[in-house]
Structures are given as structure tokens and as C-alpha cells.
């Protein structure tokens, strides 16, 4: 595991996220060689501020937008400079058994932009059978990744969920991944990426383990950003 920083999407997605928070996230991503995951409004700021691979979230965090509006949001984020997009699955439609609607919605969003689209399935809200269904639906929609969670529902990424979802597509484990021990468990379960607001902590702990050292974690510099659950 020598490419860990490039597999971390350092995240700032809290409801009180400020431009200063976004710049801090980008500074940390640059310092540690990570990617960044930010709100769509912040993409123009980010592209002017730093050369960091950017993911923008779309229809976040509930995934209940109309298809046309979500496609438009995706196009705007891509046009502003986002390298990848994380959209949210409509969990209500999934639970109602509206599988065709779920798949068709994702298919249209994926087709609307020429960049990879990850689909957040909000795994903490789903049964194993629903995870299997949504994994297949997202794969059929030609998305690039399955992502476990937004971080806004109770619970987050689990090894069990990653093991199920990784049968269908590469997985971005997100939600509650706050340490290198957490991230390592997700990678070992089959995750390809990690999304975490504590990405800097994860990389420092990985570096320390690799060097046989320990580190003392400083307090976050990010005013108002929620760094407790990893998003």
C-alpha cells in the first residue's frame, strides 16, 4: 500500500463549510498528496486556488432531485473544473422497489458528463438484499464507483458493506472513516478509495506506521467543519 495518499479524498462537506474551510482542505490535500471532495459551489474557488484532483458532490446529501436538475448540476460542476462527481442515489425509490427509475436516473446523470461518476448508496439505511440490488443497478448504469455513505445518516462505512458492494464496482468507503486503522480495514475489504474529512490524520498515521513511529495529532484548523464522522 504505497499509494495511499492518492486513494484518499480529503473532504469538507459540512453544512457550515466556508471558503476558508475549503482552502484549508485544499492546503492539506496538497501537503499530503491527497484528492479533495468539496461542495459544487466551491469548485470555481478550488480550481483557482490549487491544483488538486477535485470531486464535487451532486444532489447531496439526500438524492431526491429531479433528473434534469441533477444532470444540469453535474454539467455545471464539470464545467467549473470538477474531475469527478459523487451523486446520491434516491434511496426512497430503491426501497419502494422502483428499480428501473433508480437505474434510469443514474444512467442519465452518468451520461451527461465526460468524467467519472460515483454513486452514494447510503449503505447504513439498506439491508444486504438492497445493497446487492443497488450494486447491480449502479453497475448497469455505467457509473464508475459505488460510494458507501454521505456521512449524514446514522452509521457509516462498514467492512461488510464494502465486501458486498465491491462485487459490482470499485468502492469509495466514506462515513466514519477517521483513522488509518479504519481506512486500512476498508482497503483490505476491497475499497479502492476513502472519503474522509480526517484524510490528513489518516495519511499521517499511515506514514507513522510505515516508518515505525507514532504521531500526536494536532487539532483541526478547519473552522466549522465537521471532522468527527469522516463524511
UniProtKB/Swiss-Prot annotation:
Biological process, per Gene Ontology: 2-deoxyribose 1-phosphate catabolic process; carbohydrate catabolic process; deoxyribonucleotide catabolic process
Catalysed transformations (reactions): 2-deoxy-D-ribose 5-phosphate = D-glyceraldehyde 3-phosphate + acetaldehyde
InterPro entries in the cross-refs: Aldolase_TIM (IPR013785), DeoC (IPR011343), DeoC/FbaB/LacD_aldolase (IPR002915), DeoC_typeI (IPR028581)
Enzyme class: lyase
Ranges for region Disordered: 206-231
Keyword field: Cytoplasm, Lyase, Schiff base
Gene3D superfamilies per the UniProt record, alphabetical: Aldolase class I (3.20.20.70)
Molecular function terms, GO-annotated: deoxyribose-phosphate aldolase activity
SMART domains: DeoC (SM01133)
EC number of this enzyme: 4.1.2.4
Subcellular location: Cytoplasm
Pathway: Carbohydrate degradation; 2-deoxy-D-ribose 1-phosphate degradation; D-glyceraldehyde 3-phosphate and acetaldehyde from 2-deoxy-alpha-D-ribose 1-phosphate: step 2/2
Active site: 86, 147, 172
CDD domains: DeoC
Cellular component, GO annotation: cytoplasm
Family: Belongs to the DeoC/FbaB aldolase family. DeoC type 1 subfamily.
Function field: Catalyzes a reversible aldol reaction between acetaldehyde and D-glyceraldehyde 3-phosphate to generate 2-deoxy-D-ribose 5-phosphate.
The protein's name: Deoxyribose-phosphate aldolase
Amino acid at each position: 500500500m504505497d499509494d495511499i495518499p492518492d486513494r484518499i479524498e480529503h473532504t469538507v462537506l459540512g453544512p457550515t463549510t466556508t471558503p476558508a474551510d475549503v482552502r484549508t482542505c485544499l492546503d492539506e490535500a496538497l501537503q499530503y498528496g491527497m484528492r479533495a471532495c468539496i461542495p459544487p459551489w466551491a469548485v470555481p474557488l478550488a480550481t483557482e486556488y490549487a491544483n488538486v484532483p477535485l470531486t464535487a458532490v451532486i444532489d447531496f446529501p439526500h438524492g431526491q432531485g429531479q433528473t434534469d436538475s441533477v444532470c444540469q448540476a453535474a454539467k455545471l460542476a464539470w464545467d467549473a473544473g470538477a474531475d469527478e462527481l459523487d451523486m446520491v442515489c434516491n434511496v426512497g425509490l430503491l426501497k419502494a422497489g422502483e428499480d428501473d427509475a433508480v437505474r434510469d436516473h443514474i444512467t442519465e446523470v452518468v451520461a451527461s458528463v465526460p468524467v467519472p461518476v460515483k454513486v452514494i448508496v447510503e449503505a447504513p439505511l439498506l439491508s444486504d438484499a438492497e445493497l446487492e440490488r443497488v450494486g447491480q443497478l449502479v453497475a448497469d448504469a455505467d457509473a464508475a464507483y459505488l460510494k458507501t455513505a454521505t456521512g449524514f445518516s446514522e452509521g457509516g462505512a462498514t467492512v461488510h458493506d464494502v465486501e458486498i458492494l465491491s462485487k459490482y464496482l470499485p468502492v469509495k468507503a466514506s462515513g466514519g472513516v477517521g483513522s488509518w486503522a479504519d481506512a486500512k480495514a476498508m482497503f483490505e475489504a476491497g475499497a479502492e478509495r476513502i472519503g474522509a474529512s480526517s484524510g490528513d490524520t489518516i495519511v499521517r498515521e499511515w506514514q507513522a506506521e510505515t516508518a515505525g513511529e507514532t504521531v500526536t495529532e494536532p487539532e483541526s484548523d478547519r473552522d466549522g467543519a465537521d471532522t468527527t464522522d469522516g463524511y
